[in-house]
Structure formats: structure tokens, C-alpha cells
Amino acid sequence: METKPAIGTEDSPGLQENSRIAEQLNRYSNLLESQGGDGFRIRAYRNAAARVAELRQPLRTLYQEGGGAALIGLPAIGRGIAAAIAEILTTGRWQQLDRLQGETGPEDLFQTVPGIGPALASRFTEQFDAQTLEDLETALRNPRMKVSGLGPRRRSAILAALSGRLEAIRRIRAPRRGGHEPPVQLLLEADAIYRTRAAAGKLRTIAPRRFNPEGKDWLPVLHLTRGGWHLTLLFSNSARAHALGRTADWVLVFCHFEDEPEMQFTVVTQRQGPLEGRRVVRGRESECARYWAGQPVGN
């Protein structure tokens, strides 16, 4: 006879964790609303929060036993929100929420990885300009990227811990068949809208935790919806952007299509070469060159 999973009680640690995750989803929807976000996204996160709060089995148990598919199978939980829940369960943080709250510093996130203390986390952000666990993994896999206090054995141990942590999240974030990146035209147009409105003082602002000793609300935030794409744009507040004086130039674009997981792009002013002075999407320079030349780009 098949047995059913045990049902938790109100005060069980698993259901308490469910409540905390539901509260985070609700907080995110409230921040979206206060910052002028799209109504569809606001409702999606609120509906997900309600379903999580009603759930009688711990999300952690579901995730451990069934992976991302178990989360996606829940009512009102699409792939994007499933990836967010997996991130919270795996790292204890949710970068999307941290971002809208102005808590964009990656050092605390990096310290959740075994082998990384406060000093090493700070060096990673300063020398690698790493902002996410994915950034950190990419930098550590590059043998040319050196940082003091990080020998080969420690580097390998951190990489192993990172890979194990990110593997399950990647499976959820992997694009569906037919999935695609946003067109560079969309990213460049959103970038232009953001910088124009920011310069005119027409955007809501948040107070970033990093490089803001006075706690001022200075970082403009823009939420846009275009053709099924949901975008959030902010100026970069990274250590490298501050060091190079690019905080009013580098624009971070976080976007997802419908209920898909989030992607991140950076738009900057090209400083040399044939596109000098033009805005380009890092990593997609060839597409930007075709766009600025008036040629078909695709997507």
C-alpha cells in the first residue's frame, strides 16, 4: 500500500520556512507595486505567496525529493518563481528581492559558500567584479583570474561547492525548447528609456546598502513590460563601476519572458573600436554592431 508524505504541523520548522518564503514573495510583490511594476507580475507573486502559505508539506522536502519539477508542479508556481524558491532554499538569499530592497551587495551571498569568509568575499567583488554566484563560478574557472589568499586546493573546493549548489538551480533556469534571449533592440531601447527618465528625475529611487554611507535614495529603478518580456533596470552599483567612475553609465538589465526564470545583461558605452560611443550589450557586441548598422539582428 502506497504511503502518503507526512503532513507538517503549523509550528514545524519546514512549515515555518514555507511561511518565511511566502513572506518574501509577498514582499517582492509589494516592492514591485510601489516601484510601478507590471500588474501581471505583482499578481503572479502574490498568488504564489498565497499558495506557499497554504501548503501543508515543507517546500524543502518537496525540493529535496523531487527537485525543480516538484516546485513547478505546485499551483501558481511557474519556472521563474520555482527558480526563486530554489535559490532561497539553496543559498538562504534571493537576489531579486535583495536588489529591489537595495541590498545588492554580493559579499553576504558569497559567504554562504563553504570556504569563503568576509575578506575573501570582498576580494572576489573587488578583483573579479563578481556580483552573483554564477559570476563567481565563471571567474574561478578562468585560470588567469588570480586573487590573494586563494590557493589551488581552496579554489577547487570552492568551485566544487559552487557547482553543487548551482546545478539544481540551473536545471530549473534552463530555457525551454524554443526559449530565447531578449532581442538587443529591446535591451538597447529599454536602456535608453531608463537613462532618459533617470536623468529627468522621473523614476522611483532606492537606497542601496553598498557605497551609500548616508543611506540616501539615489539609485533609480525602472520596471518595463514589452511583448511578454518583463524588465527591471538599475545603474550598476558594483565596486568596479565605482572605481572606474561608470555608475551612471553601466546599466544592469534583469529580464524574463512570461513565467521563465530571470536573465541578466549589462549595457555600457563602448570605449573603443568601431562602436566607440555607442551603447552595447556586453557579450552581444556583434548583434549590437548589426543593430547600429541598420542590419537584421534576429530574435
Task: Pin down the residues of each PLM region.
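Catalytic DNA-binding helix-loop module of base-excision-repair DNA glycosylases/AP lyases
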Residues: 80-87, 118-126, 154-159
